[in-house]
Amino acid sequence: MTVFKIVLILIAVVVVGVVALILFALHKESNYYKYTEAVGEIEQKYTAFGDKEVSCQEYDANDDVIGKYAVWYPSELESSNTQYPVVIFANGTGSTLSTYKPFLTHLSSWGFISVGNDDENTRTGASLEETIKFLIAENEKKDSIFYHKIDLDNIGIAGHSQGGPAVFNMVTNQEHGSMVKALYAASATSSYHTMVMADGWEYDISRVNIPTFLTAGTGSWDAGNATSKEQVTD
């Protein structure tokens, strides 16, 4: 066998290996719940996929910032007269709804209408506000599959990273903030950013008066040491 053929074989093996790793990573991301080692009874139950099949509809938002809305929902909704509770998600910096598709699909498997959009800078809560307005309108459209099937009395919001300030600002600053019944923030960005960037990152969590669930990781991005007194008191 010539050196050239050996090199080609080695290149082919490497390419196949890389492709396999990429495909596995994508599979693992979409099926993250299968690889999560939940400990508590509640965590074990809800980490698993729910018993409902899930469908998705996309809508043009007619807004360059928001881009589009995507709505995941239990497939049974289309032939049901039941109203379903809602979770609206605020993206982290530079992320679009495709990043969180597995999470939103998972929520809908447990009976929620889960909604995202393509806003990559969510911190003010404005795109969450527009999403609620969109849902109110869809709930009143007789030709919509969501006509009178959205439980507007049970809306929760969630956000990751910059989406943390978004959920806080949604309930404290936006017109329909009072419609939100609970919020969740994962690795919420510090309001300390406001002092550095002065571009709308501020929020006042002391004004939030609804059930709130906050989580963060233990790595340096989430749990690094404060480097100033302002960060300590944030």
Labelled PLM ranges:
Residues 81-92:
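Short beta-strand element of the alpha/beta-hydrolase
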Residues 166-170, 194:
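Hydrolases whose catalytic domains are alpha/beta-hydrolase-1, hotdog thioesterase
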Residues 1-16:
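N-terminal Sec-pathway targeting helices
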Residues 181-234:
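The feature captures the conserved acid-bearing segment of alpha/beta-hydrolase catalytic domains
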Residues 170-180:
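Conserved hydrolase catalytic core segment
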Residues 27-82:
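N-terminal cap/lid segment of alpha/beta-hydrolase-fold proteins
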